[in-house]
């Protein structure tokens, strides 16, 4: 093992000098002697000097301290022993439940599966959330992004998806908390514990109070654990189907931005790192399904200032199979989940995948909502009375559709007092089919607000 010494410290970026013939490789992990601090080599500057990022606080470090190279990348524990545990970016337990009892470790930097190994699936994953199942259905082994600005419900939507999918799904889940609130990580842990699925979930946290090195690598740590479960074959030669939840992928980009300038790179558009697309690609290309097993990933993506054209969310869009866009306008009108039915898309919304009936109903719903959007300007200027009868009908139906897209969530029960509802896809299709056909034109629109299936609407209307 070669050893060197610290010659410069600027925030999270540390320069270390080694003997010229024993310079560590890029991505090798270095250990600062006498501390818990791990460094990761990012650049070789020449003359035996390497530039590194600290995985943890640099408090108390000083020039001249000795550093030992491990001659290997950062590796983390993998396997069944990680289930039910909370770990940090280096795979160290932070739940005070003793060490992670496994000998198996894998490096966090790995190659993405080759093109020949990948396998696509068209099996649908029912979420029980009407607007998602109807307009932007998820595929098993697909990648989903939840896009939204601050406070429109990304985390609540993700928690509900975890509640509906992870609890019903017999496989394993990995949750990577990247630069998010510690409170949310804590809530998630207790949510899993209370519903008795903690022994099927591995949790990796690098929250927003952590240094940028942790936030930059914690997504890779979670992904490495998920890849192990996917690739570990059972006696039939099959891997597992794994769910990977990442909250929030934007903070991964942000951590890269924080260290990029310190590493001496010129910033690109809006101050992001010039390697933004590559860093995102390296992470996203590994989140994929192979012939042995699948990784279905659901990622929350923060949208700065509600601007979807910002380079960070725009780069993420390219990698996803389904995009669920949360809208501030819909949230402000009191409709939750605040999912925009016209902006959200999915590759699975294809008659060959979801079937002709589902496809036609979804498109008809979008047509009605689009027509209503166009009529809004006329209504604002001239009022409803000036519309043709047929347009009035479109408006009434569109308002009912909008309200019918709202739904009480299980994870929000403690706040709203309303029991959560899970609506099967068949029920969702039946409800919207009837709505479009005019079967429920006589029911007042408030009966459609915050209910489950269409039968509840009818029952609610009778009480009004």
From Swiss-Prot:
EC number: 7.1.2.2
Keyword presence, DNA repair: no
Leading EC class: translocase
Signal peptide segment: none
Catalytic activity: ATP + H2O + 4 H(+)(in) = ADP + phosphate + 5 H(+)(out)
GO terms, molecular function: ATP binding; ATP hydrolysis activity; proton-transporting ATP synthase activity, rotational mechanism
Binding site for ATP: 148-155
Keywords noted in UniProt: ATP synthesis, ATP-binding, Cell inner membrane, Cell membrane, CF(1), Hydrogen ion transport, Ion transport, Membrane, Nucleotide-binding, Translocase, Transport
Location in or out of the cell: Cell inner membrane
GO CC list: plasma membrane; proton-transporting ATP synthase complex
InterPro entries: AAA+_ATPase (IPR003593), ATP-synt_VA_C (IPR055190), ATP_synth_F1_bsu (IPR005722), ATPase_a/bsu_AS (IPR020003), ATPase_alpha/beta_chains (IPR050053), ATPase_F1/V1/A1_a/bsu_N (IPR004100), ATPase_F1/V1/A1_a/bsu_N_sf (IPR036121), ATPase_F1/V1/A1_a/bsu_nucl-bd (IPR000194)
PROSITE patterns, per the entry: ATPASE_ALPHA_BETA
Any matching Pfam family: ATP-synt_ab_N
Membrane topology category: Peripheral membrane protein
Subunit annotation: F-type ATPases have 2 components, CF(1) - the catalytic core - and CF(0) - the membrane proton channel. CF(1) has five subunits: alpha(3), beta(3), gamma(1), delta(1), epsilon(1). CF(0) has three main subunits: a(1), b(2) and c(9-12). The alpha and beta chains form an alternating ring which encloses part of the gamma chain. CF(1) is attached to CF(0) by a central stalk formed by the gamma and epsilon chains, while a peripheral stalk is formed by the delta and b chains.
Family assignment from sequence similarity: Belongs to the ATPase alpha/beta chains family.
Reported function: Produces ATP from ADP in the presence of a proton gradient across the membrane. The catalytic sites are hosted primarily by the beta subunits.
Protein's name in the database: ATP synthase subunit beta
Organism annotation: Acinetobacter baylyi (strain ATCC 33305 / BD413 / ADP1)
Lineage, broadest ranks: Bacteria, Pseudomonadati, Pseudomonadota, Gammaproteobacteria, Moraxellales
